[in-house]
Design a protein with these regions (language model features):
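Short acidic-glycine-tyrosine-enriched beta hairpin
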Residues: 55-56, 97-115, 206-222
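Ligand-binding loop in jelly-roll beta-barrel domains
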Residues: 88, 116-137, 195, 222-246
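Bacterial signal peptide processing site
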Residues: 13-15
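Histidine-centered metal-chelating micro-motifs
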Residues: 70-73, 110-121, 179-180, 216-228
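A short glycine-rich, His/Asp/Glu-containing loop-to-beta-strand
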Residues: 48-72, 80-83, 151-179, 187-190, ...
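Glycine- and acidic-residue-biased ligand/ion/polar-headgroup-sensing regions
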Residues: 78-97, 185-204
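C-terminal motif of bacterial Sec signal peptides marking the signal peptidase cleavage site
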Residues: 8-11
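Surface-exposed beta-loop interaction hotspot
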Residues: 129-165
Length: 247
C-alpha cells in the first residue's frame, strides 16, 4: 500500500450472562469478581455503537471510537494498541480491580498502551473520538529494511511520537512540494489528519498518485518508497508502524 501506502497511519455492552450470574449495574465495580474471570471481550462486538472496525488484516485492526457525553460501556478488552485522539474529551476508565481513573485527552494526544480490560464512560461535555490501532501479534521482530528507516532518512518529515511494545507512532507532515528520499516502513496503519495528493515512487521507479483524503484509514504491508506532496495543501497523518511478526 502507499504511505505505508507510506503515509500508510476505548469500551462496551456487557456480553450475555446465564442464570444468576452477577449483573452489571450503573456502578461497574459491582461486577468486579465476575469480570476478573472473563476472557477476551471484543469491544467492537460488545459495543458496536461505540466501536466501529474500519480495517482488520495482518494482525492489525483499526477501530474508530466515538463516545458522546454520557455514553458508557460495560467491561471489554483490548490487545496492545496505539491511540490517537482525533477529537479530545474527558473519559473515566474503570479497572477490574475496582480502581477508576479520569483521563482528559486533548485533541492530538498519542499513546501506546499494553493490552487492558476495562469499562469506559464519557464524563466530559464534548464528544470524544479516538482512533485505535490494535495489534494482535506476538512480541518479536520482523524483517523489514530498517537501514532505510523513514525517521533516519527524512527526519524533517517523520517525527516519532511514541515507540514501545514493538509499536511506533509517527507524525507525518509534508508541505506542498516537499519530498522524501527512498525510505522504508514495516507493516503499518495510517490515519490521515489533513489530506492532499501524494506521489509515491517504489524501488523500481514506478509512480503512483494517491488522493489522501481527511479521515482516510488503511492498513498496509512493509514497503520501500519515496513520497512527494504534489497537492496544494499540507499533508498530515499518523502512521502506526508494527515491528512484530505475524502469528
Amino acid at each position: 500500500m502507499v504511505l505505508g501506502i507510506s503515509l500508510a497511519l476505548a469500551a462496551c455492552n456487557q456480553p450475555d450472562k446465564k442464570g444468576d450470574e452477577t449483573k452489571t449495574t450503573g456502578s461497574t465495580g459491582t461486577a468486579k469478581k465476575e469480570v476478573a474471570q472473563q476472557a477476551t471481550i471484543d469491544a467492537a462486538k460488545a459495543a458496536p455503537n461505540l466501536y466501529k472496525v474500519v480495517s482488520d488484516t495482518m494482525g492489525i485492526r483499526i477501530v474508530e471510537v466515538t463516545y458522546k457525553p454520557g455514553d458508557s460501556s460495560a467491561w471489554h478488552s483490548h490487545p496492545d494498541y496505539a491511540i490517537y485522539a482525533a477529537e479530545g474529551g474527558t473519559a473515566t476508565f474503570y479497572g477490574k480491580d475496582g480502581l477508576k481513573m479520569e483521563n482528559e485527552m486533548k485533541t492530538g494526544t498519542i499513546m501506546v498502551r499494553h493490552g487492558e480490560f476495562h469499562s469506559v464512560k464519557n464524563t466530559g461535555k464534548t464528544t470524544l473520538k479516538v482512533i485505535l490501532v490494535e495489534v494482535n501479534r506476538p512480541m518479536g521482530t520482523m524483517a523489514w529494511d530498517a537501514a532505510n528507516d523513514a525517521v533516519k532518512v527524512a527526519g524533517n518529515l517523520y517525527k516519532v511520537a511514541a515507540d514501545t511494545l514493538g509499536i511506533r507512532v509517527l507524525q507525518i507532515n509534508y508541505k506542498p512540494g516537499q519530498s522524501s528520499a527512498l525510505h522504508s516502513h514495516p507493516d503499518n496503519a495510517l490515519y490521515v489528519i489533513e489530506g492532499s495528493k501524494g506521489e509515491f515512487t517504489d524501488k523500481a521507479g514506478k509512480k503512483t498518485v494517491v488522493e489522501l483524503k481527511k479521515g482516510m484509514m488503511m492498513i498496509g504491508p512493509a514497503e520501500t518508497h519515496s513520497v512527494k506532496n504534489i497537492g496544494t495543501t499540507t499533508m498530515k497523518a499518523i502512521l502506526v508502524e508494527i515491528s512484530r511478526p505475524m502469528k
